[in-house]
Amino acid sequence: MNTTFEKTRLGICLVLAMSFVTAGSVASSDRTLLLADDPAKGGSTHHATRRDAMITALASANPNPSMGDEAQTFDRLVGTWDAEFTFQRDDGTVSQKKGELLFGWTMDGHAIQDLWIGYPTEPQKERSIGTTIRFFDTTLKQWRVVFINPQFNYVVSAQGGREGDRIVLRGVDTDGLPIRWIFSEMKPDSFHWQGEKSHDGGKTWKLEEDHHMKRRL
């Protein structure tokens, strides 16, 4: 793996880790601290170092060697993806927006994190942002996943893994109904993501989210 790609992976991890610290935005007082590497601007090097330390410690350039071949389940998604998001509501209406999706390793390579960013559309003024942490449970022999979106007070968990040429994760939504997330058509420069929900205990599934990703980095 060349040096340029390694630096790209690490940079992505730092961006993902920063989502925990900033939650997508930084107050004006904090912005001053983040720029504090220049004392001439009235900053303090102590503050900048304190904030950067957590980000640096959390990010990992590669999966932990202890994960073995299981790391390849999600390692192929590491990078930055341009996203075309499609949402299908219960009333039959469909909404679309553009955004991006970033993947990178964290926690000494024992977990992989992603960051979902939806660009704002009128009349919205703020981007939507959510993040997922995944790790392979060596007892269950499955990937365990937690997704959070603070803007909507939304937290949901799922678990699963590779099923043929797809990745399928199953869980329960906040309304108590079964959900499944499917990664498919996975190629080096593109993949397809679908979010489905069942209203009959898993007998049939309704498509709620249908997203297409193309690799940027």
Model-derived segments and spans:
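Residue-level recognition of beta-strand termini and adjacent short loop/turns
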Residues: 107, 187-189, 217
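Conserved Ser/Thr-centered positions that define the repeating blades of beta-propeller domains
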Residues: 196-199
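Hydrophobic membrane-insertion alpha-helices, especially the h-region
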Residues: 17-19
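Short beta-strand edge segments in extracellular beta-sheet folds
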Residues: 212-214
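Central antiparallel beta-sheet cores of small beta-barrel/beta-sandwich binding domains
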Residues: 57-59, 64-66, 71, 82-182
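Amphipathic/hydrophobic helical signal segments and adjacent flexible N-terminal regions
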Residues: 2-14, 24-94, 217
